[in-house]
Amino acid sequence: ALLPTASSFAMSTVFKALLWLAAAAGLLYLAGCSLMYAQQRKIMYLPQYTQVAADQTNFSLQRPDALLRGWQVHPSTDMNNPTTPVVVYFGGNGEDVRYAMPQLQQALPQSHLYTLSYRGYGASEGEPSEDALVDDALALFDVLRARHAHNPITVIGTSLGSGVAAAVAKQRQPDKLLLVTPFDSALNVARHMLPWLPVSLLLKDRYDSVSRLQSYQGPVL
C-alpha cells in the first residue's frame, strides 16, 4: 500500500478544518436564528423609554388581561356636539405619547383627543405583541364610537402606530386615516435590516399595512 504523502496529509487536515469551521458557522447561524425568534419582541418593542406614573394619566381602558392608561383632551365646546371631531392617536415605537397631546391640541383645538400607551408602555400593563396591540386599538375605537356615537372619528398613526392604525382602518372604517412615517410591513423592514436572516420564517409580528389598507374605504392622508 502507498503511504500518504505530506501534501495529501496536509490537504486532508485543511479539509477537516474547513468542515469544522462550516459546522461551527452553521451552529452559530442556527443559534442566532433561535435567539432572534425567542427574543424578537424584546428587540422589536421599546417600552423602556416611555415609563410614566399612573397618576399622571387621565384616561384608561380595562382589557380582560391588562389595564391600559393614557390621556384625553377635550375642547371647551359641548361634549355631546355631534359635529366635534374625535381623534385617536397611536404613537411610534418608544414614543412617550403624552407629549403628542399638546401638539395635537394646538393643531386640532376643536377636537376630542385620545391616546393610550401600548401594553407595557407608559403606565399600561401587559406585554406588547401585534395581536394584543391591534385588539386593544379596536377596543378603544369601539369605546369611543359608543361615547361619541355620531361624531366623525379620525385615526392617526405614527411609525409603529401606523401599523396599528392600518389594522383599525381595515376593521372599523374610521372617517379619516392619517399615517405619519408609515411602513409597508414590518416584514419588509426586517428584511432590509437583517438580510442575512430568514425573517419571513422567524417574524411573529408583521404589521402588513399595505394588505390591510386595501380594505379601507376612507381617505388616507
Language model features: what each stretch is:
Residues 67-143, 147, 151, 163, ...:
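Membrane-embedded segments
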Residues 174, 178-188, 205-209:
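Active-site nucleophile loop of the alpha/beta-hydrolase fold
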Residues 157-161, 165:
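Gly/Ala-rich beta-loop-alpha elbow adjacent to hydrolase catalytic centers
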Residues 130, 183-202:
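Flexible "cap/lid" loop of the alpha/beta hydrolase fold
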